Amino acid sequence: MDLKDIPESVVIDEVKAIIKATGIKLQRINTGCFVIGTGRKRRFIKTADAGTCDFEGYDMRGRFCAIECKRPVGGKLSAAQKWRIDDINAKGGVAFVAHSGEEALKQLQERGCL
């Protein structure tokens, strides 16, 4: 498969496998909103704030850790995602963008998360 044809969902699955294999305590976070109910019981549910990373939790040392997954070609951070990643890192946590499971593993190792 050509890199430009790899969707973000494949990257998310690869990173999820790395998280499971290493035992790091990160969970998948979905952002956005959806509607439940009908008529007068119809409600909008917001799942997470804009900029929340795809995986968030804590590393083996107890530090806050977040991974944002992007397609290898063409995946771009939103302003809210960039701000959140920068803010987490500035406050002593670990946050980064991964374009593959291999890249996520390398970043986790280099940053002392495992």
Model regions and ranges:
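Catalytic phosphate/metal-binding cores of nucleic-acid and nucleotide-processing enzymes, i.e., regions
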Residues: 1-114
